[in-house]
């Protein structure tokens, strides 16, 4: 694994607590707990301590593992307080409005930080100092959250890939490269495997808590249409859903029961499946030599892939600014990034060589993440940004398309037109700009 570098190609992360319940399903005693003075309302840490408010690693075990990383690498005393996104947003906004900021450092997903941009310090100078870390152009552009200056420093990342039991390679069609799949090749493989095995052996997480909507948002539609929202009902989108309808006929119908793919993959019910890296990691845990992790397929517009990126931000008028900057510098160093990967399965955002002693599953995923980001035509997509409590309603629109097109066989264009109206109704009430891969605009809506 020494040839693995996290340096995505320069192209033309849903809550982690849900995804990483115990490292396998998704993703030391608490450091300085006694002197933290830090509660879920964001109360101040003690003097000389970085009060770190974050949306990440909320389960107790994850939090404790990350506190151990901070204790080892942060180069400053840190009181780490993990809260849900709603508390995070209200705490930052309320303290900023009151002119009484008690935090020093903020950590959250891009979509959680972007709406708070006006309450965050410009970190352009800090990023210039860290230019040697190898943050990609795409990531640096995202840190500007639609403005002209950066509001956070990339912290860690995750994405979605395809897990392959090597037994399925028996049915890989001639000319199809498992490490460079096209959607056409993926469909042909699924059909051949179904025929060869006598049953469908491809699956997807289409259960009640599955993340299949992220497949349509970040992979299928960007790959076929080049967008996610603006292209939602155009001719290319209809082609994408026609494809999805045909693919569904080759997938196991039990997919509608799968909340994650690692369990059906591990028991052999499914041999090939797409999901979040944190929801695949247990599948090859006991026999990594029998597995591959590969990039998602590419389509007519490129290889759409959804990036889950978390960032570190400085609240305006925050406490212990020098120590907070020191912590950011330390947490962007390769060794601390690798330790975060080991402990909580979030991948580095810096260019770094990964050690050869990573666990088999993590090593497999690391290779797939790298290939996916560096592939020709890689097209970065983000989860919805700035929707707040409405994100669930937007995600439901994509789930409705799957339900009505793939399960109920309703006319595709009719479904897209109806759901586009619903999507625009939600977005018009929010008046937010679009997110990648759609172009930045003052108002996001379906064309």
Region spans (language model):
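N-terminal secretory signal peptides
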Residues: 1-13, 24-30
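N-terminal export leaders
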Residues: 14-23, 169
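Long, aromatic- and glycine/proline-rich binding clefts that accommodate carbohydrate-like moieties
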Residues: 44, 343-400, 404, 435-447
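Extracytoplasmic "Venus flytrap"
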Residues: 47-66, 83
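Extracytoplasmic/periplasmic substrate-binding proteins
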Residues: 55, 62, 112, 215, ...
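Extracytoplasmic "Venus flytrap"/periplasmic binding protein-like
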Residues: 68-137, 170-173, 271-272, 282, ...
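Hinge/lid segment of periplasmic solute-binding proteins
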Residues: 109-159, 187, 292-294, 444-447
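Glycine-centered hinge/linker elements that transmit conformational signals in sensory
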Residues: 189-192, 227-257
């Amino acid at each position: 694994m020494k040839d693995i570098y996290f340096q995505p190609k320069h192209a033309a992360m849903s809550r982690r607590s849900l995804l990483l319940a115990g490292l396998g399903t998704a993703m030391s005693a608490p450091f300085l707990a006694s002197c933290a003075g830090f509660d879920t309302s964001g109360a101040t840490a003690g003097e000389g301590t970085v009060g770190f408010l974050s949306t990440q690693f909320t389960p107790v075990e994850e939090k404790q593992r990350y506190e151990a990383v901070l204790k080892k690498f942060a180069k400053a005393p840190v009181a780490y307080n993990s809260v849900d996104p709603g508390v995070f947003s209200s705490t930052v906004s309320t303290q900023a409005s009151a002119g009484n900021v008690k935090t020093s450092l903020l950590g959250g997903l891009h979509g959680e930080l972007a709406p708070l941009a006006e309450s965050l310090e410009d970190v352009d100078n800090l990023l210039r100092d860290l230019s040697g870390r190898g943050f990609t152009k795409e990531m640096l552009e995202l840190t500007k959250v639609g403005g002209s200056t950066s509001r956070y420093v990339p912290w860690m990342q995750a994405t979605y890939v395809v897990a392959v039991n090597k037994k399925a390679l028996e049915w890989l069609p001639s000319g199809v490269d498992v490490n460079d799949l096209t959607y056409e090749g993926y469909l042909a493989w699924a059909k051949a495997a179904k025929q060869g095995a006598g049953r469908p052996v491809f699956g997807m997480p289409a259960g009640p808590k599955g993340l299949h909507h992220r497949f349509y948002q970040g992979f299928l539609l960007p790959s076929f249409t080049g967008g996610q929202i603006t292209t939602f009902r155009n001719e290319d989108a209809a082609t994408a859903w026609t494809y999805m309808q045909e693919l569904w006929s080759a997938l196991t119908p039990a997919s509608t029961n799968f909340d994650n793919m690692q369990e059906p993959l591990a028991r052999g019910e499914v041999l090939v499946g797409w999901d979040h890296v944190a929801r695949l990691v247990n599948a090859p845990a006991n026999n990594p030599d029998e597995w591959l992790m590969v990039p998602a397929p590419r389509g007519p517009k490129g290889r759409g892939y959804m990036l889950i990126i978390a960032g570190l931000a400085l609240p305006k008028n925050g406490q212990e600014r020098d120590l907070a900057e020191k912590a950011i510098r330390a947490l962007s160093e390769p060794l601390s990034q690798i330790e975060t990967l080991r402990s909580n399965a979030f991948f580095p955002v810096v260019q770094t060589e990964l050690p050869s002693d990573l666990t088999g599953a993590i090593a497999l995923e690391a290779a797939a993440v790298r290939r996916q980001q560096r592939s020709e035509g890689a097209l970065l997509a983000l989860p919805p940004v700035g929707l707040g409590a409405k994100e669930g309603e937007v995600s439901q629109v994509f789930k409705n398309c799957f339900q009505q097109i793939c399960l109920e066989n309703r006319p595709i264009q009719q479904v897209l037109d109806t759901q586009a109206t619903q999507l625009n109704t939600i977005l018009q009430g929010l008046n937010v700009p679009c997110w990648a891969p759609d172009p930045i605009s003052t108002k996001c809506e379906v064309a």
